[in-house]
Amino acid sequence: MVGLCACNPWEQPEEEKDIPLAIFKTFWEQMDKHYTCFEEHFVNWDSIYYTNISQVNELQNTEDLVPIFQSILNTLKDPQLWIGVPQKASIQYRLNGSLESHGITTAKGTDFFIDNKNNEYLPSHQIYTLRLSHKCEDREFHFAYVSALSFRNKNATIYKPLLEQVAQLQPDGIIVDLRYNNKGEFPTMIEFVRQFYEGNRPILYTVQRESEENRYNMTHPEPYSIDGEGTVPDSIPIIVIVNFLTFGPANVCAYILQALPNTTVIGQTTTSGGGSSVSGVSLTHNWALHFSNDVKYYVNWHCCESPLHLNVLVSESSAIYEEYIIDGHKEVLFIDSSIATAINLLESMIPWKTSPLGIFNATGRLVE
């Protein structure tokens, strides 16, 4: 997607026909010197040059560079890459898809989750109680739902008291929904994840380039350790839900939580990104480039720029209806398939006294 101002930022004097070539060469050279994720994105950077240079040589206007740069950025699939003319035009890899409504509603159509429409950037949470039965045993099942809608800096102080409130209610499990996270900042995401563990632990490893001459010569991994606050006891099972809209800090958040005890990540494959630091350089003729200047790895040695490796794959969310006993009352609920899977997984972790191992649905029926 390319935004243009009313005055064409690529307009140039007729005699300066070599400008597109100069911009392309400068772009390629700066990426070759500084970019760190060629291997992670399976891109042969020399091939990118030789594939495009003939076409660039024939260009008459800088505007004609747009589809070439867009194709290159789409190949790299790195949302942190940006090239353009500051304040005038930009070219960037953009995610496809639109936000969808999600959650649980009653059959009557009333909202069962906290309404987020007027609170777009703030987290929401709710506690649900389901009554489960099997043989001679009845028990209540409490689960918490936490939707981390944003990791913007203004939310940095919100998550701890919210999770303290959740933990005080001692739920049987917590569902953390990252599917609709509106990006944000790395420090706010870290403030969120450190509530789920206690003590000092490495959560990421950073690798940088050792020189500009060799794009594949990298430093030894340096651990990035953060003290956890342990607001949520690690004895509480956590189900994290993600999908293709989960990228940037939310993707990193899911990876870090996945490495903690008692955590399962479900849903659809994430888009990636979010862990690497970003730098910018000036190109020629007022063009600029922003890029990732390091590579971060999780404790399982998966790259932050890679889509998350799911524990449980759930087909794209679809509407299903199930009958639940909630606070002693029977209700028919609409639940998307990812949340339904999360509930079933949490139910399977309940220490039933009389039942064999298995997964129970909300009415206590054993799922073979």
Question: Each PLM stretch: what is its role?
Answer:
Residues 6-208, 216-218, 348:
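Flexible, low-complexity junctional segments that flank or bridge functional domains
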Residues 1-5:
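Sec-dependent bacterial lipoprotein signal peptides
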Residues 8-25, 144, 173, 182-368:
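C-terminal "post-core" interaction segments
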